[in-house]
């Protein structure tokens, strides 16, 4: 039985961990995840999905603020693990820890070398990629730069957003890891170096990148909106207030970018640089998320054709 330390944080990682727990070829000696955080306006302390999964399985849990140089790292090195599996952990692993293991692999939610970094699923959508995927790779000091052990792709559909693609790729990552790990541990797979000329980076989304620029095409804005749904959520400004847009569809239309072209009972169409967007799910300032019909029947009922959204 191969003894593992698992490291991860969000739901994506929890799905991978649960997959490993179903396979009797592996024993999880410890789980490392990010510390509990205060979230929301009420600052409620929230455990990571990986911590919740580990607690349900009765596993030992470590939550160092920073792994490098921590007492927790020294403890982990004394457990006698054969290797480390990480999936969206959110911290760099120290070379000292990596060097103490027979192997260390990462489950990364992109088709490397494209989309290295912390937001690969977001950028796959924002940049209009036709496919997404998962790469199992060896861990090295440089971020997402290790040799590739295996890759698996799935198509991106127009119905996908960050939430749906996360769910799909979590299952792909779980299955690909379980399919790959035995042969890799046995030495039957020769990892492939990444083509550095094809590397792109997908860092965490910055707040200023959440703003919609109506001078882009309807397709570009459609991809940005779904590439930030359900988090961090794209926004524009309407009458000076922040206006979040969760869902919109590209449609035909022509006008000044940001101009309201049409208002119906269940329709609000806004011009872009090329074509238009039909807004479907929005959140006005100080209000909950709602469908466009609810918005137009409520706080949006005073809108008129010709008014403009800011960016």
UniProtKB/Swiss-Prot annotation:
Keyword field: Protein biosynthesis, Transferase
Residues given in the record as (6S)-5,6,7,8-tetrahydrofolate binding sites: 110-113
Keyword Lipid metabolism: no
Residues making up the signal peptide according to the UniProt record: none
PROSITE patterns listed in its UniProt record: GART
InterPro entries referenced in this protein's UniProt entry, alphabetically: Fmt (IPR005794), Formyl_trans_C (IPR005793), Formyl_trans_C_sf (IPR037022), Formyl_transf_N (IPR002376), Formyl_transf_N_sf (IPR036477), Formyl_transferase-like_C_sf (IPR011034), GART_AS (IPR001555), Met-tRNA-FMT_C (IPR044135)
Disulfide bonds: none
MF terms in GO: methionyl-tRNA formyltransferase activity
Top enzyme category: transferase
CDD domains associated with the record: FMT_core_Met-tRNA-FMT_N, Met_tRNA_FMT_C
Family according to the record: Belongs to the Fmt family.
Protein task: Attaches a formyl group to the free amino group of methionyl-tRNA(fMet). The formyl group appears to play a dual role in the initiator identity of N-formylmethionyl-tRNA by promoting its recognition by IF2 and preventing the misappropriation of this tRNA by the elongation apparatus.
Record-given protein name: Methionyl-tRNA formyltransferase
GN (gene name): fmt
